Amino acid sequence: IKRYYACHRKHSDIFELFLPQTTLRAQSLNHITALPFRAKDNSIVLIHRLGKFDPNVCSFEELMRLDFLIFETLLTNPVTQLCGITMICDLKEFSAEKWSEFTPSRIQSIFEIYARSLTLRIVAGHILNAPVIMNSLYNLSLNRLDPGLKEKLIFHPTGEWEELHSQIPPKILPEEYFGTLPSSGLVNLYDLINSNEDYFFELMRYGITPWS
């Protein structure tokens, strides 16, 4: 617990106002949703469309705050505590302007938060529609990645779905990934975190607060 709150204090630009109400601009991007069905290993499947990030709409820190609010909320489910999450990270439309927001120090912060603060187990991370520059950045970041996390990342060549479908059945994937699920069937996670504002106020009582 001490490590959890120490990490939050260190990255206060993300966690100082760790409340859903501070992420409304990021929520307007609608960049993260969940499948209505769990994967074969009972993990929740999240779709993170990083290409929807717009630095003219919200800051990098607000986007990360929203993501970690969602992860914290998912952890309140006992099944998810045990089985974790499977992440689909879609980099379609992720431009050079957006890449420029991911500075080495920010990337390092993300890795550190995952390693020292996030208790939600990541089962696998499927990277889709990655631009060429992503491979270069990934190779530069390899030595900073936690070995356990590194083993879980899978890069899928654009337009090739066989490996993704071998791990996540097409019947629970949306049509854009050559599945059969209508996009309208995806789960809105923002309603979930917005209804838990009191829960996050309680969390802040024990760690970093905007008045500390």
Feature annotation, model-predicted:
Residues 1-212:
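Basic, amphipathic alpha-helical/coil surface patches used to engage anionic, phosphate-bearing ligands
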